[in-house]
Amino acid sequence: GDILAARDTITCGGRYMNDNVKDTARSIMNDLGAADNAQNRDCAAYAADRLTGRVCASDRDDLKLAIENMTGGANTVLYDNAGRPSIMCAIPTMTMDDLYGNGDPSVHPAWVVDGDVKKVIYISKYMNVIEDGRAYSLPMRSAATYNTFEDCVNACLRKGKGWHLFTNAEWMAVAQWSKRNGTRPHGNTGDGCYHRATYERGLPATMFCRRAHLVKTGSGPVTWNHNHNASGIADLVGLMFEWVGGLRLMDGVFQIIPHNDAALYDENLLKIDSRRWRAVTTDGYLAAHGELNTLKVDGTVPGDALEEDHLLGRPVVSTELNNRSYLGAHTDGNQGYLDCQFCDLKAADGMEIPELAKILG
């Protein structure tokens, strides 16, 4: 009885322990495990597994079934190569007609990975935390911040095959679904609340100048989810800046990784010299870097060589780069920048934006 009580106490308190205390607890459990009594050994193994983040098969099944039952299968639990859980949203295959109502029966690129059409894609329900170098989708946490693109890519890849940074194709599919279904998500866009409805608040995770800065993942109302339902993807709007894979600007040129191939398990996939990057031409075809008539971001006014943060003007989508923002020598410092809301981004006179570019943002 005393051993069982100790097991439960250590198990329940494991998440609150620092590493030194956890090491001590593991040592105690190891000592117990050396005892002849089989019950002692079982208790020691159980507690040690829970302390190190592993979950036995029955616990895994219970957690997975509970989450799926509560959400009607819209959410599930997936485990990584360390045996640790993430709560995920299961998004079944959607066609272009499903998302745009255009009569096109072809599958949206987000469900096409290396030529294979997926029946479902899994997207983190919560902004991720990073623990032991791996990213996890968990509720009521302070999400990871101040990480480079490479940090975030690697935190996903370390979890094993199938795990990847949220791709641009996936992001655009979710955003379009919300738009079409009238559930554009709200979020933490102003000191812990939604700026257009300040009564919508999340639970503070960090404070700045006595005001909530970040909020705990998933702590906002259901309107902060992509479907305005408890089963939805939380915090897509506000909270923090997010990285996505498969879209970049290279020397002013829009480049994508076709379909949802940015989800492939490949440590070199998203690197600067990856051969999978493609530009988009004005007629909607994919092209190698340097080819003519590809989409670019140009300025509306001439740039300068000032190494300081300052607004130059608005960007415009063009096939030419006539007004580069920065004209000085290479620097990692601040430079002039172009700015406008995405919905206000225009194409140069006489130019049409191809559908592929619209679909992938």
State each model region's role:
Residues 7, 18-31, 40-51:
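Amphipathic alpha-helical segments in structured regions that serve as interaction surfaces
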Residues 32-33, 49, 172, 197-214, ...:
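C-terminal, surface-exposed recognition/capping segments
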Residues 32-33, 49-77:
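Charged, compositionally biased non-catalytic regions
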Residues 67, 75-162, 251-313, 324:
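Extracellular adhesion/carbohydrate-recognition regions
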Residues 107-236, 265-267:
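Short aromatic-cysteine micro-motif
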Residues 179-185, 248, 255-259:
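Short secondary-structure boundary/capping segments
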